[in-house]
Amino acid sequence: MPAAAQPRRNRFIRTLAVAATGAAVLALPVLGATTASAATPAVSTATSLGYANNLDGWIRASLQVMGQHGIPGTYNGIYRNVIRESSGNPNAINLWDSNAAAGIPSKGLLQVIDPTFRAYHVNGTSWDSYDPVANITAACNYAAARYGSIDNVFGAY
């Protein structure tokens, strides 16, 4: 190929590469949504399990999921810890302790940090650590592994 044609050919190849990349980027959300929707299992929430969307319903829904997975705990044990940790606020976040200083603040009803939430997440619940049922269930799973049950937790854990 003559030297004069080389820059024009390189420009054409770069243009094709950019166009192909752009097309792929535009197609990803459509392809991903189709694939993800087909593979996404149903998530248990208080309302999907027939309970009210409040603290009582969240605890009862969590107990139902916990029962299905053999995670011990009682209504009173969960309630006591929720009130101490977040006063029942599912959006509570601790921005002042050592976890927060390390960039992983405690979140949700039972003030779980993200690494613990991910490690003790229970299938069938949301992966959102602020989701009340997912937060309670993961925290109870952690408490069961560490203390035998959430019922045995009487302070920060």
Where are these regions (language model features)?
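Peptidoglycan cell-wall recognition and remodeling modules
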Residues: 53-157
